Amino acid sequence: MEIKNIYLGAWFQRTSLHLKEFYYFLETGESKLPLEKEKLSYLHRELEVKNFSWQEREFFDRVWAKFDNLEMSFDEDGLILFKKEYQDLKTDCELLKEFYEERLSPVINYIYSLGAPLPKELAKLELILPYIIEVYQSDRKEVEKLFNQFGDSIQSVAESPEASLYFGQKFFLFNLKGEGIQIEPIVEILIFFREFSAQLNGYLQAHRTIWEKISQIRSQEVLRFKDFTSIRNSLMEVKQTLSFVEARLSQMEKFIAVRRTWSQNLENTLKLLSIYQFDTLANSQNYMTSLWKMTKDYADSTFNLLTILYQENIQREVDALKLVTIISLVISFSRLTEPLFSLNFIGSVLLVFVFAGIFYFGMRFWFRSRKFELR
């Protein structure tokens, strides 16, 4: 068995604008955004890029970069692929993981740190990053032995005339039967499928969390007015998350359509290797879009209901204040027959304002202690 290369990949939704920002950083160690120059310079030094280039392609422009022991490609739709020539599998995997987590991720997180933040419901999403091994002329026993050395096992196998694909928990292994197949485009699609699926799963879990949060509000028989502010703030966070996911799902629809067109020549190979998922993921994306629209409608109706109740209560406070003011003025005018600075006049005015204040704040306390029925 000849082990050729080890791959690791990720996919984060990006655009050509983001790709140009990353290329500018590689080129200058700077950013056109208002970021700390010292930190940018430090991150650039830590990255230790040896060579890089901008590659214009038919579907996706790409930034290619070479580092000490590996190379990386970064496509404009956000797909990142790391490739390392095999030396020692354990060391190679650790090096790829260390580079991704300790050197590249801080760069990506910082140069794209401005703008809409990732909602807290999505902040804990863990990306699925299997190691992908490229080998030549291997058999099942050799693959089983290799997997067992690292505490993994073969879950399934798919065959095509050009290659066999072994699926494990930690590793995917491509056993190439000759030189007639380009492995990197298939690896890219495999990573795209897994990351796309992982994001949809994350959005599904976030939907469940948000729906439960809204349901807990709606399931209460009564709501206290004094709780409206905290509930409103919570719903505002929910609406922010809904807007974020709505935009992401719309982008995902476009990304998967372009990737499908890009991989047309690979369709038969992908199907034979049991990794063709364009139809399945497109259907899942459409379902998730409908699910989040329903969640958005649920959140909007709850928010609008609370807004109506809140405005009604505030209006009652305003009406009470108007009533107190009118009564105070009427009583004050009725005492104008008294000398302006006489003790009787001053005492009457003070008494009116004291009773008016007691009446108003009593009404205000009552309004703010109200409970509203939601059923």
Locate each region found by the language model.
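Membrane-associated alpha-helical segments
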Residues: 231-334
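Short linear motifs at secondary-structure transitions and domain/linker junctions
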Residues: 47-48, 54-60, 140-141, 147-152, ...
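Alpha-helical transmembrane anchor segments
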Residues: 315-375
